[in-house]
């Protein structure tokens, strides 16, 4: 079976993990954590990066940091992972879902302003497949209405929008280092990017169980105490060691994934030209990271038939999110603003093909040949 995904392995992970084990410190904020955070800050230009156990934890941390209260409204696309919404629902917020653009599956920036009320606190753009949302428009809306922007850049590590790294444009950005992402911290992991310097001190406190422990270890206070609400949002240094190996090889991983993505695009372009499928669209000003390669079929039946055909050929291809507004929790905790013109329809057409760092050329050729055979 050719899997849909396999965690990236570059070969130096075990060496760094053994080094972490020999250091005598495996908990959070060890040497490898500091290396990773500094690398991310310097590479992407964020004021402060804090490693977390997951992107889910980063989103929850953002909701705490922005002091989301019951009754507040948070705008986001319905076509996203449940964590995007859960983080704010946990604080009592109401989720306001907005339709997506069919070209990128990102939130339609032209529909956001109509969804803003006097209760709106946050806009959460989700950079689907590592392709940027229209951030200039979103940030202008946030400034006009005095709102915060939390970028769900779970899939966006190494992607840019008009030269700026995804996750560094909004007030807060959230990365994922889950094993399904381009870079992993040994299976699970995330990072919170604090781009508004006024939020840094409280972010450190919330991440450290509500204490000023970070200031204590920097020698800024003689003891640390309970200062605020918080939780334990630290990644273990053993996981950070795994992540460090991946970040050292980040450019190599990125180039390999982009090459695999382009192979698919070039091979399937004739099918798109013939109108049989649709291929991903990368808007001007966006540089993507080849997080995924998807095609769009005619409808859900067409997609199901192809999934079954590929499965019989020992190839795993998968659809993606069930739109949140149609789920029981989505109906309870949120509402869809305006018309669902594209979210549901486009989600039922989308199929993701195998794409991961260690995908062999022969296996990718097999996937392509099988697809071409199906459509012939």
UniProtKB/Swiss-Prot annotation:
Pathway: Bacterial outer membrane biogenesis; enterobacterial common antigen biosynthesis. Keywords: Pyridoxal phosphate, Transferase. Coiled coil: none annotated. It comes from Escherichia coli (strain K12). InterPro entries: DegT/StrS_aminotransferase, PyrdxlP-dep_Trfase, PyrdxlP-dep_Trfase_major, PyrdxlP-dep_Trfase_small, WecE, WecE-like. Its cofactor is pyridoxal 5'-phosphate. Optimum temperature is 37 degrees Celsius. It catalyses: dTDP-4-amino-4,6-dideoxy-alpha-D-galactose + 2-oxoglutarate = dTDP-4-dehydro-6-deoxy-alpha-D-glucose + L-glutamate. The keyword Hydrolase does not apply. It is an enzyme of class 2 (transferase). The modification N6-(pyridoxal phosphate)lysine is found at residue 181. NCBIfam families: ECA_wecE (TIGR02379), PRK11706.1 (NF008687). This is dTDP-4-amino-4,6-dideoxygalactose transaminase. GO terms for biological process: enterobacterial common antigen biosynthetic process; polysaccharide biosynthetic process.
